[in-house]
């Protein structure tokens, strides 16, 4: 069991990296990767959101939305309902609630990070990496335990990617980059090269 969870975690971090394998959450990924400190802060926020939303959405799916999920009510009519068409709406609601709680927490206890993240903190709500993790969980039919491990792993993978990119971009400030590639140009090339590097993990059998 432990080996299964460990392989799932490693696969989520390296083999199926949200940013560098699926290119999810690229808007925030590019915009907040200018400084390592800010990138780490946002990375931790994404880890927290994914670690909570994926398992919670798993519970909602298996206890409320799936056909037969409402059998615990004792009503045959309710038990026969298939409410999976409400999945996207439910997942978005959970993600928005968790992000709002995180935003209020950072505003109160870590105002410097809250100000540094700016508009991109509430935009975690519409970060497709967050929704993508929940949809992957549904598609792969993860158990609750697997969804916890996958949520944390997906968050750690995204945080690792944005931190690495931020470190490279800080070094690029002192590099002789051609004028036509300064800014987003060299950043996109860097992300592409990082993605090629992470592709080497695709051959790992877990």
Swiss-Prot record:
Pfam families tied to this protein: Rnf-Nqr
A GO molecular function held by the record: oxidoreductase activity, acting on NAD(P)H, quinone or similar compound as acceptor
Known partners and oligomeric status: Composed of six subunits; NqrA, NqrB, NqrC, NqrD, NqrE and NqrF.
Keyword check for Flavoprotein: no
Membrane topology: Multi-pass membrane protein
GO annotation, biological process: respiratory electron transport chain; sodium ion transport
Keyword Transferase: no
EC number(s) reported in the record: 7.2.1.1
Record's catalysed reaction(s): a ubiquinone + n Na(+)(in) + NADH + H(+) = a ubiquinol + n Na(+)(out) + NAD(+)
Entry-linked PANTHER family: INTEGRAL MEMBRANE PROTEIN OF SOXR-REDUCING COMPLEX, NA(+)-TRANSLOCATING NADH-QUINONE REDUCTASE SUBUNIT E
Protein keywords: Cell inner membrane, Cell membrane, Ion transport, Membrane, NAD, Sodium, Sodium transport, Translocase, Transmembrane, Transmembrane helix, Transport, Ubiquinone
Cellular component, GO, one term: plasma membrane
EC class name: translocase
Membership in a protein family: Belongs to the NqrDE/RnfAE family.
Protein name: Na(+)-translocating NADH-quinone reductase subunit E
